[in-house]
């Protein structure tokens, strides 16, 4: 499903642990790392797509995570010309993404990159909060900077908000910011993580 402007609707997923680190995934057969992400199918909400992608790409179930926040706006990036498929109709020029911030509440042993026949990732690790902004492929960097800045403003408060999973993605950004989590983060969790 591609919109009138040529962007494919997509969800992006940032999973944090209790130390304030984020899950960073290695694309299969490449030395390229990114957050889990995936397209939204027809007749599927952004939230439904997020949970489907969460399971397909990292093997986690809804019970393994707590939804903390949803980005207020759709964020877009354009694909480089070398990645465009000029023969496809309609042509996709990039992705427009709704981003979800999740906290891992289950066991990290449940993370499994091989839940499908064609996995997206073949490795993962925990990295410091801001590490992905500097390390992601250049054409995604602006989106990563915006989403991490938005998520940081949530996580750096004494009471980070959570989202009620029963609401649709459209209303998530409004309602998500009014609920609060029991986990309290401080700024130091995100600036220095061991090994980074």
Swiss-Prot record:
<dbReference type="GO" id="GO:0006402">
    <property type="term" value="P:mRNA catabolic process"/>
</dbReference>
<feature type="short sequence motif" description="Nudix box">
    <location>
        <begin position="38"/>
        <end position="59"/>
    </location>
</feature>
<comment type="function">
    <text>Accelerates the degradation of transcripts by removing pyrophosphate from the 5'-end of triphosphorylated RNA, leading to a more labile monophosphorylated state that can stimulate subsequent ribonuclease cleavage.</text>
</comment>
<dbReference type="InterPro" id="IPR020476">
    <property type="entry name" value="Nudix_hydrolase"/>
</dbReference>
<dbReference type="GO" id="GO:0005737">
    <property type="term" value="C:cytoplasm"/>
</dbReference>
<feature type="domain" description="Nudix hydrolase">
    <location>
        <begin position="6"/>
        <end position="149"/>
    </location>
</feature>
<protein>
    <recommendedName>
        <fullName>RNA pyrophosphohydrolase</fullName>
        <ecNumber>3.6.1.-</ecNumber>
    </recommendedName>
</protein>
<feature type="compositionally biased region" description="Polar residues">
    <location>
        <begin position="167"/>
        <end position="184"/>
    </location>
</feature>
<feature type="region of interest" description="Disordered">
    <location>
        <begin position="166"/>
        <end position="196"/>
    </location>
</feature>
<keyword id="KW-0378">Hydrolase</keyword>
<dbReference type="InterPro" id="IPR015797">
    <property type="entry name" value="NUDIX_hydrolase-like_dom_sf"/>
</dbReference>
<dbReference type="GO" id="GO:0034353">
    <property type="term" value="F:mRNA 5'-diphosphatase activity"/>
</dbReference>
<dbReference type="InterPro" id="IPR000086">
    <property type="entry name" value="NUDIX_hydrolase_dom"/>
</dbReference>
<dbReference type="Pfam" id="PF00293">
    <property type="entry name" value="NUDIX"/>
</dbReference>
<comment type="similarity">
    <text>Belongs to the Nudix hydrolase family. RppH subfamily.</text>
</comment>
<dbReference type="InterPro" id="IPR022927">
    <property type="entry name" value="RppH"/>
</dbReference>
<dbReference type="InterPro" id="IPR020084">
    <property type="entry name" value="NUDIX_hydrolase_CS"/>
</dbReference>
<feature type="compositionally biased region" description="Basic residues">
    <location>
        <begin position="185"/>
        <end position="196"/>
    </location>
</feature>
């Amino acid at each position: 499903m591609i919109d009138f402007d040529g962007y494919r609707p997509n969800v992006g997923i940032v999973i944090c642990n209790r130390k304030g680190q984020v899950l960073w995934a290695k694309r299969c057969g490449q030395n390229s790392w990114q957050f889990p992400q995936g397209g939204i199918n027809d007749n599927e909400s952004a939230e439904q797509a997020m949970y489907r992608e969460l399971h397909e790409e990292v093997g986690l179930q809804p019970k393994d995570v707590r939804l903390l926040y949803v980005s207020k706006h759709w964020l877009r990036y354009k694909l480089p010309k070398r990645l465009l498929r000029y023969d496809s109709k309609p042509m996709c020029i990039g992705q427009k993404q709704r981003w979800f911030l999740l906290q891992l509440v289950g066991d990290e042993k449940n993370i499994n990159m091989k839940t499908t026949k064609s996995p997206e990732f073949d490795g993962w690790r925990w990295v410091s909060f801001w590490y992905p902004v500097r390390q992601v492929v250049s054409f995604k960097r602006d989106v990563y900077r915006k989403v991490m800045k938005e998520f940081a403003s949530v996580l750096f408060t004494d009471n980070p908000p959570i989202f009620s999973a029963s609401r649709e993605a459209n209303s998530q950004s409004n309602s998500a910011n009014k609920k609060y989590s029991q986990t309290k983060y401080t700024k130091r969790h995100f600036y220095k993580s061991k090994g980074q």
